[in-house]
Amino acid sequence: APTGGLVAAATTSLPEDIGGVRNWDYRYCWLRDATFSLYALMLAGYHGEARAWRDWLLRAAAGAPEQLQIMYGPAGERRLPELTLDWLPGYEGSRPVRTGNAASGQFQLDVYGEVMDTLHLARAAGLQPEPHAWEIQRALLDFLGANWGRPDEGIWEVRGPSRQFTHSKVM
């Protein structure tokens, strides 16, 4: 995207299995993908794109740490309400067809670590540092220090009660 955001998919509602109901909208920028995306761009020599992605990430993470989302729209949109489009049949009849993603409102502790890892990788890879990155990281670390023991929805994006996930604590 011209904003520097990297979208996970160009499609919505492709089923995890034909006829199933796990048909999500992935047309968003996921913070969990940030480190791997930045690393791939740097390895491939796309330093300008890597810098644009890092800058996009800094804009997304610049708010209050407790409001950090797991995903954003390509231009940093925060409101991603999930709607079902019941009049559409879906791929191979797999319903529902969705737009938006309710997981955007989930608390997933590991994304804080993913953001930290991405910003560390950006510096280690030689991207021009951004002075405000340290302020953002300090705020994220303070939040993590106070909240690391909270249950969350985890990498699995569980729809239901929050739980304790090892992955969330380690990342």
Label every model-predicted segment.
Residues 1-171:
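Acidic, mature catalytic/reactive cores of soluble proteins
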